[in-house]
Amino acid sequence: MQWLMRFRTLWGIHKSFHNIHPAPSQLRCRSLSEFGAPRWNDYEVPEEFNFASYVLDYWAQKEKEGKRGPNPAFWWVNGQGDEVKWSFREMGDLTRRVANVFTQTCGLQQGDHLALMLPRVPEWWLVAVGCMRTGIIFIPATILLKAKDILYRLQLSKAKGIVTIDALASEVDSIASQCPSLKTKLLVSDHSREGWLDFRSLVKSASPEHTCVKSKTLDPMVIFFTSGTTGFPKMAKHSHGLALQPSFPGSRKLRSLKTSDVSWCLSDSGWIVATIWTLVEPWTAGCTVFIHHLPQFDTKVIIQTLLKYPINHFWGVSSIYRMILQQDFTSIRFPALEHCYTGGEVVLPKDQEEWKRRTGLLLYENYGQSETGLICATYWGMKIKPGFMGKATPPYDVQVIDDKGSILPPNTEGNIGIRIKPVRPVSLFMCYEGDPEKTAKVECGDFYNTGDRGKMDEEGYICFLGRSDDIINASGYRIGPAEVESALVEHPAVAESAVVGSPDPIRGEVVKAFIVLTPQFLSHDKDQLTKELQQHVKSVTAPYKYPRKVEFVSELPKTITGKIERKELRKKETGQM
């Protein structure tokens, strides 16, 4: 407990006494190139692997031996001047305490499910690693969810526990009685709440002594809910192999991270990107994970952060770069920034060119899914081809295939596939939990069919051409139309609806709803009704899903069997009709 009293951060977060940070060169220690996390060849899979013990504890030992520089493992700030800095040894202490809270206080066991619904606060990382230490399967989710979304996820996953914040506790309480599996509710807050355990107090008083479970590499580690087109989100279950991927030399080459690097990734905490780019990848390299907690997106704050702190690796969806470019500057030089990455959306060639012209930096594109993690990428030193996402990353063999799983010739449009036979890649999702039919449906011959369309050139560069499903990609948020349509139809004005993506110069796509009104609402003011429907969707599901565009129609295009033809509506939006 002496250390916790000395290290005043998370519980009673201290105000930083340094308004001006030292120059980047003073903050970033020299690279300890002779050391690195345990690694294997690109296709060798160890029988046992647990990220907490094999990687985090490895770096903690290096710190103890004086063989890692002074950079923190974790560096968190917010707009109020609060700051948290943890070393790997301190992370080890805290996450072992968290592990004991889960197993001893909450009675959770290896294989149990725990819903993790936190914003970008330090506790998110403690919970994720604490779950790894105990073998508990954590289920990240965005904090933008509403009671209906939470109910669906808790019921489908049979989660025995949940960790969340004040703002969501009431939503959870409103549906908890319908979740028979839910036994433990942990609250991250400065205030108590009836029926909830105080996460921070429990961690303070927990023992720092804990033995990490022995995990098989193929034991389950995490579940991500991924948007569906004809139904609600599916559960993509991953093994510990997802956390092993950054240890492969071919993957390490992607960013060539060093212990001296400071990496900032702007990802929603519910995305797979957060688990990979703000946890397993940077910490595999022993570098600093930097987080600026932004309750509201603010382009100017992002620019100020990149100017103020020694961040040299930065990741954001392409719309973030477009928003930065819209700011009033002809050129800008970030003092420490060296590597910029993007994913989640297609990068326009003109944005790549403009970013380089105004910042002097290249923009490296990467591509992945909730089911796969990183599939392909461009990386430092690699030729950038505008319009192409890069080449396959180990351990994946990526090909463009037809509907039967046959590999297509170069520059031929087809389905982007990942080879799963004779050996399934260790970082590919295990299955859609509880849905063997959907799991089997995405297998196509010897390949996993991503559901995305693309083509590959003679050099192995992959071009993304679009989705073969109806998923809407708005600023990196993947939105299933069924979720929005289900929310809309709850309103008495909506007889039926169809939701598609509509092109947008900033967000890539926005949600557009085509709505057939019920007779009693036909004479209502359409502008007022649009606002009412938008607010309704925000109130019953995650606000980012609301339709920014609404068009009232007399009927929807349908097939002879009565199925709505969203592709016809998409053509209308893209001017193809």
Curated annotation (Swiss-Prot):
Keyword Ligase: yes
Regulation (activators, inhibitors): Activated by monovalent cations, such as potassium, rubidium or ammonium.
InterPro entries with a match to the protein in the record: AMP-bd_C, AMP-bd_C_sf, AMP-binding_CS, AMP-dep_synth/lig_dom, ANL_N_sf, Mitochondrial_ACSM
GO biological process: acyl-CoA metabolic process; benzoate metabolic process; butyrate metabolic process; cholesterol homeostasis; energy derivation by oxidation of organic compounds; fatty acid biosynthetic process; fatty acid oxidation; xenobiotic metabolic process
SUPFAM superfamilies per UniProt: Acetyl-CoA synthetase-like
pH profile of the protein: Optimum pH is 8.8.
Alphabetized UniProt keyword annotations: Acetylation, ATP-binding, Fatty acid metabolism, GTP-binding, Ligase, Lipid metabolism, Magnesium, Metal-binding, Mitochondrion, Nucleotide-binding, Transit peptide
Pfam families the UniProt entry points to: AMP-binding, AMP-binding_C
Required co-factors: Mg(2+); Mn(2+)
Entry function: Catalyzes the activation of fatty acids by CoA to produce an acyl-CoA, the first step in fatty acid metabolism. Capable of activating medium-chain fatty acids (e.g. butyric (C4) to decanoic (C10) acids), and certain carboxylate-containing xenobiotics, e.g. benzoate. Also catalyzes the activation of lipoate to lipoyl-nucleoside monophosphate. Activates lipoate with GTP at a 1000-fold higher rate than with ATP and activates both (R)- and (S)-lipoate to the respective lipoyl-GMP, with a preference for (R)-lipoate.
Protein name: Acyl-coenzyme A synthetase ACSM1, mitochondrial
Modified residues (N6-succinyllysine): 85, 146, 183, 204, 237, 356, 391, 538
